[in-house]
Amino acid sequence: MDKRKQSDYDNGKSKPTNGSKTTKFNLIKIIIRNLLIGILLMLVLNTIRFTSKQPKVEILSPDHIDSFTTLSDIELAQRLAKATTFKTISFGESDEFDQYEPEFLKFHEFLKITFPKVHKYLKLNIIANYSLVYNWKGLDESLKPILLAGHIDVVPTLFLDKWTHPPFSGHIDDTYIWGRGTMDDKGSVMAILESVEDLLSQGFKPQRSIYFAFGHDEELGGNNGAFNINKYFDTNEIGPFEFILDEGLPILLPPVFPGLSKPIASVGITEKGAIDIKLSVTIVGGHSSMPRRESAIGVLAQAVSKLENNPPSPKLRETRLLFDFVGRECSLPYRFLFSNLWLFEPIISRVLSTKPTLDALQRTTTALTIFNAGNKANVIPMEANATINFRVVPGDSTNDIIDHVNRVINDDRVKISKISNIIEPAPVSSTTSKSFNLLQSTILQEFPDVVVAPTIMIANTDTRHYWNLTENIFRFCPMVLENSDLQRLHGIDERLTIKNYKQLVDFYYHLIKNTEKYL
């Protein structure tokens, strides 16, 4: 042994023992244990504090709800059914539109006949020949007006032989109103006008002015209708608006959200952007008997596969608000998770990724929609083209997506040949405003068993043209649907229940009246 060390020990300094090592180890264990206990207590405390964000409202009795209208449910349904018989189909090509132009004009006349008080007491402006803007002047011009929006055009109908009832027949049975436009969006337009007609019959006069804007080409992007409606407001110095409510998300019956047994009324406080990117590959072709090692189709297929397998990273910014509202109403295990997103968010995001409908709420989606190459079985084409539609989540920009495409493909043979239909994600409306409280409270009055929650609108609406008119834009329609009904939108057998259509009328009626109370 080193003499110096031996001397130290001889002078009374003790050697390290296993006991001291054990003491240090036990101290570390105590620290870790206390830390874990502290984290657990914080998780539990967060769960306890995670209470409902649904306001307490006066639930309307059935007698009170029904007292405002003299029309029966079936009479209301018949008027909507008649509205669906007009083939107000939106087409981009002028020669195609010409054959449907009379249908729009006939629909205008139908509205004048069906809602005489609306057309007597409200000022109507026809915009771009077919879009409609009504002005219901308020008693106090110092108050900001509100805008209720919708659209009167519908998408074309395909596979007519698969429809239970012809899409423009105006068919009604004991339960449903069948036809193109019942859900998107003549149901909302007619319900709004029914509610106004009833309010006028009672002599109701709003404190603030109310505008109603119904575009004629929403299904094509609103570039003629809503775009010119915005110009009309700007030219006439109308606005800013207190809020805008347009078509949007429905009330979905469970199961929709994990751990939640109630229906969800989702209010779109923003909406995704969009961009179409066309990819092209040009490589020498030739006869199929002498193929080269690479082909335009093969190279492009690999590029598209890379994009599908490497989507943009998730962005849970606005989706956190959905979790914040809905998570508070979930059963305990899920409430524990959603009240502690700081810890469990990566796990929740991974779960969302397994379901396309939920994954669309957290990331920019990638959809290959067009692929063109070749026209003969024994000829290798020298060119292949593909168009990918991206729906851009708030937090990403369209430029981010262009960079993403180039980075993921990383192949000089693949060129971006065209970029089109660029829409940036919409601004986000506040959930703490009086306007949101008005909307949430009115929904709960009419549908007391639902959970109202803000979310991202994954499709685009006419509101893309209205961003400059207000900070408060909401996208919601009180249709009550099951998940299986969503395919009827733009699909086969579009329909709405007679009972639910009456609820639409009730909802807009009380929304207008509640502006006096909540704003």
UniProtKB/Swiss-Prot annotation:
PROSITE patterns: ARGE_DAPE_CPG2_1. This is Probable carboxypeptidase S-like 2. It comes from Dictyostelium discoideum (Social amoeba). Its cofactor is Zn(2+). GO terms for molecular function: metal ion binding; peptidase activity. Keywords: Hydrolase, Membrane, Metal-binding, Protease, Transmembrane, Transmembrane helix, Zinc. PANTHER family: CARBOXYPEPTIDASE S-LIKE 2-RELATED, N-FATTY-ACYL-AMINO ACID SYNTHASE/HYDROLASE PM20D1. It comes from the Eukaryota. Pfam families: M20_dimer (PF07687), Peptidase_M20 (PF01546). The chain crosses the membrane at residues 25-45. Zn(2+) 2 binds at residues 151, 184, 246.
